[in-house]
């Protein structure tokens, strides 16, 4: 309830330095005649009025005062009566401009008080009594004072539980320091006073509320074109009670800096409404397009956008923050069926409330009109994402639903991502749900199967993805056969029936009978295609039995099926038991079969040739089921088997590292040794001679 932005205090430096000009000169417009001086020239600080009075410059105090008042105007427009802002002016002492009372939390009170304070005089004496520290001390004391909401919470909880009331705040100090050392001393003084204030607020004194945390923002402003020795610093944790950040900014840009800061302080977003048609002030017969920047809650954008939409952003000249660009949509009459559902409404306020485009847009909305705003999609088309309207003298932005809403008709289950799917096993799924229904028991049955066993392990969602469940519509006994396979309490009679059905399948395969698929249209298939169909049928049948093999009867069925496949010439792969179970979960029944590894070590030449011939025939028969990667990989393996392996692997014992280039340098050593052995003989012969 009491967030850190609940309390914000501005401390304005009212010392002599803030009476100097900001060095940004503003040209004066004349209704008649031409200005005598150059309006774009920039003069000295002392010549603020320019040549002939055609230009003037604001003081540092005026820039700081205007920007801080605009800050609180935005806060009070978007959070009326919920967020509180106070002002403290500091020179020889701290001057309180307003309090936490709702009667002083308004623009009229603050502006009248600022007029009475006035611009600091240049004739003030240079003294250490003029300091911003007085205002910082008063700001900490103001944070300890409760607001009306905190007073109501104190009345509900009682005086003994004041520590349970959150009390956080933010202090924005606008001053000017010489260097980083001065800033460091300012931070240390603020932290010390903060700790002292919490000591006074603790029992038994109980002078105010304990400050849980404070965020200090120091804005060091300088005239335009003047370099400062104070460096910028991002948010830094000074102590558990204090976080400090420092920004050095020129006086004309302080309004942009505060607008950037307020976006993060109150979780706001900036939106620029572009292409607003407006009559020209000079020529009423023509019109031009203008842009107006507004501020609102960030949720106005976050709840609207879906994955198919992007927010077009841009950075305005002179600013450092991004603004979302939305285009003015010409108002048109539309019925209730053409309106999109509204996801939320949020208060808005213009950034520059005194500009002519902003005032025209505000008056247009306050007169009862509504404005639709468009945003471009990624595909290039446009969508109406927001709407501006006014009610009760307040302007709201409405976030419209640009994706599928809950009020739209739900999409059909047959409209899948790959096209229209019409063969879902809906009736079988309903029967499976009824069969899998569980009821609680008062006493746990130790003989009951575990919960994981009760869950179905294999259930194709569509008929086209399964051969077994596709054929049960055309083979009368297949439905009963599949029901027996998944029974948890299979007995000997059920096993015998299943054995008979499996033998019938193999008899029909040996006779060359074609499986009654609906897509064959009664045409006679080739022998190889018929064998492929039976092979896939046996594979899916084996997978189904393997997943339900919980009794000895299921295991007997599995062994008989595997033996029949071996007799038929379609034996399953011999691999680890865990690997076959993993493949049964991960592979589809229609996936291509794996190739058997060729193990010919220690066999005779004739047996090797026969096994290679069988393997090649098997590969040729199953090449239609293999992918391109399998074909290329097998070709690379066959080529690599023809080449000799690296001699380092062949000659090096197991566990040792092979030496690279073992004969490198041996020839040079032999030459040196031979030369050394020949030289003494030559010397001996010369001596003898």
Swiss-Prot record:
Keywords: Cell cycle, Cell division, Coiled coil, Cytoplasm, Developmental protein, Differentiation, Meiosis, Mitosis, Nucleus, Phosphoprotein, Spermatogenesis
UniProt keyword Phosphoprotein, yes or no: yes
Gene encoding the protein: asun
This protein's name: Protein asunder
Region (Disordered): 591-619, 665-689
Coiled-coil intervals, chain numbering: 521-550
Subunit structure: Belongs to the multiprotein complex Integrator, at least composed of IntS1, IntS2, IntS3, IntS4, omd/IntS5, IntS6, defl/IntS7, IntS8, IntS9, IntS10, IntS11, IntS12, asun/IntS13, IntS14 and IntS15. The core complex associates with protein phosphatase 2A subunits mts/PP2A and Pp2A-29B, to form the Integrator-PP2A (INTAC) complex.
Main location: nucleus
GO biological process: cell division; centrosome localization; dorsal appendage formation; flagellated sperm motility; meiotic cell cycle; oocyte nucleus localization involved in oocyte dorsal/ventral axis specification; posterior mRNA localization involved in anterior/posterior axis specification; regulation of fertilization
Modification after translation (UniProt): Phosphorylated.
Compartment annotation: Nucleus; Cytoplasm; Cytoplasm, Perinuclear region
One Pfam entry name: Mat89Bb
Family to which this protein belongs: Belongs to the Integrator subunit 13 family.
GO cellular component annotations of the record: cytoplasm; INTAC complex; integrator complex; nucleus; perinuclear region of cytoplasm
């Amino acid at each position: 309830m009491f967030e850190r932005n609940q309390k914000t205090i501005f401390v304005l430096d009212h010392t002599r330095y803030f009476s100097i000009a900001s060095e940004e000169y503003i040209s004066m417009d004349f209704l008649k005649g031409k200005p005598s001086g150059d309006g774009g020239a920039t003069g000295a600080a002392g010549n603020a009025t320019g040549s002939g009075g055609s230009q003037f410059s604001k003081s540092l105090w005026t820039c700081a005062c205007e920007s801080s008042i605009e800050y609180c105007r935005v806060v009070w427009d978007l959070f009326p009566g919920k967020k509180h802002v106070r002002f403290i002016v500091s020179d020889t002492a701290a001057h309180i401009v307003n309090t936490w009372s709702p009667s002083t939390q308004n623009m009229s009170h603050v502006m009248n008080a600022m007029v009475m304070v006035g611009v600091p005089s240049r004739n003030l004496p240079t003294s250490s009594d003029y300091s911003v520290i007085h205002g910082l001390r008063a700001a900490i004391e103001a944070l300890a004072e409760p607001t009306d909401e905190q007073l109501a919470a104190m009345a509900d909880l009682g005086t003994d539980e004041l520590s349970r009331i959150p009390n956080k705040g933010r202090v924005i100090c606008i001053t000017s320091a010489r260097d980083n050392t001065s800033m460091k001393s300012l931070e240390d003084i603020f932290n010390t006073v903060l700790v002292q204030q919490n000591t006074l607020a603790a029992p038994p004194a109980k002078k105010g509320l304990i400050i849980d945390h404070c965020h200090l923002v120091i804005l060091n402003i300088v005239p335009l074109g003047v370099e400062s020795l104070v460096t910028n610093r991002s948010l830094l944790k000074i102590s558990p009670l204090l976080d400090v950040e420092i920004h050095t900014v020129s006086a004309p840009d302080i309004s942009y800096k505060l607008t950037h800061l307020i976006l993060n302080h109150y979780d706001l977003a900036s939106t620029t409404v572009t292409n607003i048609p407006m009559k020209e002030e000079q020529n009423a017969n023509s019109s031009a397009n203008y842009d107006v920047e507004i501020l609102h809650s960030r949720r106005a954008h976050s709840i609207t956008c879906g994955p198919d939409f992007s927010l077009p952003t841009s950075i305005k000249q002179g600013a450092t923050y991004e603004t979302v660009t939305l285009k003015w949509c010409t108002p048109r009459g539309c019925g209730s069926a053409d309106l999109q559902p509204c996801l939320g409404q949020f208060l808005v306020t213009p950034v520059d409330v005194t500009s002519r485009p902003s005032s025209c847009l505000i008056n247009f909305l306050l007169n009862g009109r509504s404005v639709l705003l468009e945003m471009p999609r990624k595909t290039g088309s446009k969508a109406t994402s927001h709407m501006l309207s006014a009610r009760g003298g307040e302007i709201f932005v409405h976030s419209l639903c640009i994706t599928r809403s809950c009020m739209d008709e739900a999409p059909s289950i047959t409209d899948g991502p790959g096209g229209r799917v019409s063969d879902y096993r809906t009736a079988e799924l309903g029967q499976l749900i009824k069969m899998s229904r569980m009821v609680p028991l008062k006493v746990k049955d130790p003989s009951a199967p575990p919960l994981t066993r009760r869950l179905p392990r294999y259930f194709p969602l569509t008929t086209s993805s399964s051969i077994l469940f596709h054929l049960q519509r055309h083979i009368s006994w297949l439905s009963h056969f599949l029901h027996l396979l998944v029974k948890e309490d299979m007995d000997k009679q059920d096993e015998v029936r299943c054995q008979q059905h499996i033998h019938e399948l193999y008899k029909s395969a040996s006779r060359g009978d074609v499986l009654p698929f609906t897509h064959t249209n009664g045409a006679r298939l080739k022998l190889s295609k018929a064998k492929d169909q039976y092979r896939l049928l046996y594979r899916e049948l084996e997978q189904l039995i393997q997943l339900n093999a919980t009794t000895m009867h299921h295991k007997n069925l599995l062994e008989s099926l595997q033996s029949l496949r071996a007799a038929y010439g379609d034996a399953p792969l011999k691999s680890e038991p865990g690997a076959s179970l993993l493949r049964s979960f991960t592979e589809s029944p229609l996936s291509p079969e794996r190739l058997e590894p060729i193990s010919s070590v220690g066999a005779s030449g004739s047996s090797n040739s026969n096994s290679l011939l069988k393997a090649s025939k098997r590969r040729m028969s199953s090449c239609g089921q293999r992918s391109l990667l399998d074909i290329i990989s097998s070709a690379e393996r066959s080529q690599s088997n023809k080449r000799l392996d690296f001699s380092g692997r062949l000659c090096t014992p197991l566990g040792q590292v092979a030496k690279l280039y073992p004969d490198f340098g041996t020839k040079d050593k032999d030459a040196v040794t031979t030369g050394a052995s020949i030289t003494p003989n030559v010397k001996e012969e010369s001596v003898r001679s």
